Amino acid sequence: MPFAQVSDGTRIHYEVTGRRSGAPVVLIQGLGATKSGWNLQRIAMATRYNTIALDNRGAGRSDAPTKPFTLEQMADDVIAVMDEVGIESAHIVGASMGGVITQIVGVKYPERVRSLTLVCTACRNHPWREDLLKSWASTAQDEGMLALGKNAAQWVMSPRSFRRLLPAIGWLGPLSVFRSKSPFVAQVNAILQTDETLTDQLATITAPTLVIVGNQDVLTPRGDSEELADIIPNAELIVISGAAHGLMIEHASTFNREVFGFIDRVESRRSLAVSQ
């Protein structure tokens, strides 16, 4: 079971799958999710890319630090995993909170990035979303993780999927979020600490960037992605019709087609530049 140990001693679990000779792709999940949230992508990537999926600190098999941490530290965790695997640069794909981590990687470590894919994410904390995250943290602390899973599901899935999967949410909740409430609350606090500095730095990103969102996303609505695409130089914006916050699961085939096509285009341009 591979781990990368970072400077503060935290061990970050990761898995490498796919074609070792393929372009490296790093997958970063969001709040309450482990690397298993990328399973539909990892399966489809198996014959194309060298895929590195990690569990964020506090989630899955990674360590859960007892001290507070920041999203910048979580971006450093991504680089530590890349160092451990021996990857000099990669296509970084991040969803939701993982998308914010991906933005930080793009700003802080431009030389390690081949491209950025920002999935259902944002670059600022709107007051209504801060209040929602605080309410989730309170639910986790006061009512437990099962109650949190039921509450959060309606923000992640489209109304149709929510109705279809409602009978299963009782067991989906604890499986899709953290082992205990403390790491979850720590990640919420890390998100809430992120300030406008990141937004101001996005214009310095030089890597090719894809911003992708569902038109039914109510947690990180289309406007958040439009803002990202406006600020980041030459960013591409794709809006998937009928998709909500969990678009990589609910609309996996469409999502995969768009993301893989973007990565392949970037790789083609890289190969052409090297040959000239």
Where in the sequence are the language-model features?
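Flexible "cap/lid" loop of the alpha/beta hydrolase fold
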Residues: 103, 107-108, 114-143
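Conserved alpha/beta-hydrolase catalytic His-Asp/Glu region
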Residues: 127-129, 146-201
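Gly/Ala-rich beta-loop-alpha elbow adjacent to hydrolase catalytic centers
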Residues: 94, 98, 102
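Active-site loop/oxyanion-hole signature of alpha/beta-hydrolase fold enzymes
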Residues: 43, 52-94, 257
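Short beta-strand/loop motif that positions the catalytic acidic residue
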Residues: 205, 211-213
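Acidic catalytic loop of the alpha/beta-hydrolase fold
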Residues: 215-220
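Catalytic active-site module of serine/aspartate enzymes centered on a nucleophile-bearing elbow/loop
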Residues: 235-276
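Conserved HGGG/HGGXW glycine-rich cap/lid loop of the alpha/beta-hydrolase fold
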Residues: 6-67
